[in-house]
């Protein structure tokens, strides 16, 4: 059990009924689903880098396809539920897997706190999770930590003249990320 004294929820009710278009996006976000045949995904050793670290690539166990999404973009008009589906994906991934380091990002922290962050907190409440029991929020650090040590981290993606290469992110390692309103930020910030 995690040392943070939080507890796994019991008897939670997850109410998620995506529209057909939302469901298409949701299917692509599943880490163990091949969009071609529906089979399970495995990580296959493809070689080693210069420091002799193993390099893996996802591959379908059944059809052997390596043409699997690594970057998924959802588009459409306002009100289509893209932010909601992305928020459900972050929360459900953190609940499903321990030690996930998930990022939710937007151009400014202010706009993130006023929108997507509220959506994430609403999902947690709607699913019956309790703050300081199943998860805790650190508003100063901009983190939401689950009982299993998975964490959602808020990040600002604005271009800052004093940091044109986004060195403020350093060697940060994240498992998954969702950038809301990606059209508002530069391509370099996404890289």
Model-found features: residue ranges?
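Short, flexible loop motifs at catalytic/binding sites
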Residues: 1-191
């Amino acid at each position: 059990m995690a040392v943070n004294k939080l507890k796994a929820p019991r008897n939670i009710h997850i109410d998620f009924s995506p529209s057909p278009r939302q469901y298409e996006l949701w299917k692509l976000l599943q880490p163990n689903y091949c969009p071609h045949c529906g089979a399970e995904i495995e990580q296959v050793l493809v070689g080693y880098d210069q420091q002799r670290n193993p390099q893996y690539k996802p591959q379908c166990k059944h059809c052997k396809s390596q043409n699997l999404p690594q970057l998924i973009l959802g588009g459409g008009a306002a009100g289509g539920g893209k932010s909601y589906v992305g928020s459900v994906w972050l929360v459900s991934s953190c609940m499903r897997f321990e030690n996930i380091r998930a990022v939710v990002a937007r151009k400014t922290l202010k706009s993130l706190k006023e929108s997507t962050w509220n959506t994430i907190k609403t999902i947690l409440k709607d699913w019956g999770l309790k703050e300081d029991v199943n998860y805790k929020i650190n508003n100063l650090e901009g983190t939401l930590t689950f009982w299993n040590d998975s964490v959602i981290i808020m990040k600002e993606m604005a271009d800052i003249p004093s940091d044109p290469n986004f060195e403020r992110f350093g060697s940060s390692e994240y498992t998954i990320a969702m950038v809301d309103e990606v059209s508002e930020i530069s391509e370099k910030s996404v890289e």
